Amino acid sequence: MKTLFFATTNENKINEVKNILDIPNLNLIVPQNFNIKETGKTFKENSLLKAKALFEILNKNQNVFGEDSGLCIEALNLEPGIYSKRYDTYKLCKKLSTNEKNQLILDLMKNEKNRHAYFICNISYISKNRQISNFEGIIKGKIALSLNDDKNHGFGYDSIFLTKNNKKLSDLTLEEKNKISHRGIAFSKFKKFLLESLFNS
């Protein structure tokens, strides 16, 4: 049995990651009350920041990884970007619900012809021997014209993001989403790496 620590407390991310990795004899542990300020200027910096913080907490003798992801919209100068999770407080200095955050994006995009956007996911892994590895996944698409929350398989900005097949990420099942999403792509690379390194050591 191999143990791997995930530097997050986001339940939605945990569920997606467990579904993607799905490696026999892998014990994925999520720390309780893990909270760290995301002060990095890029997704990579933030994912590494989380991984390093957890690595320190665990006395530098466990395999850990951190992940950072977000939505980048061309017409908004690639915002919300690294502020995706906290775009409400960044933009309006107040907390909004998920639907309200999605509506905020749609309001900012009102009458905007260029609706191109992409989701990005970055993973930073630190092994027991202090080797650092990085993995990234991107899905390109467009911002929808309206908010449709009839189906709610996803989370975050899934309900306003249209894939190349003109389907919202929120319309997909978890399995369907993980085959094409930024997180699915990044963690598939990470899974391959783990099987070749961690499980062959």
Curated annotation (Swiss-Prot):
Pfam family, one: Ham1p_like
Cofactor(s), by name: Mg(2+)
GO cellular component terms attached to this protein's record: cytosol
Record: residues binding Mg(2+): 68
GO BP of this protein: nucleotide metabolic process; purine nucleoside triphosphate catabolic process
Gene Ontology MF annotations: dITP diphosphatase activity; ITP diphosphatase activity; metal ion binding; nucleotide binding; ribonucleoside triphosphate phosphatase activity; XTP diphosphatase activity
Entry function: Pyrophosphatase that catalyzes the hydrolysis of nucleoside triphosphates to their monophosphate derivatives, with a high preference for the non-canonical purine nucleotides XTP (xanthosine triphosphate), dITP (deoxyinosine triphosphate) and ITP. Seems to function as a house-cleaning enzyme that removes non-canonical purine nucleotides from the nucleotide pool, thus preventing their incorporation into DNA/RNA and avoiding chromosomal lesions.
Family, similarity comment: Belongs to the HAM1 NTPase family.
Description of how the protein assembles with itself and partners: Homodimer.
Name of the featured protein: dITP/XTP pyrophosphatase
Source organism (scientific name): Borreliella afzelii (strain PKo)
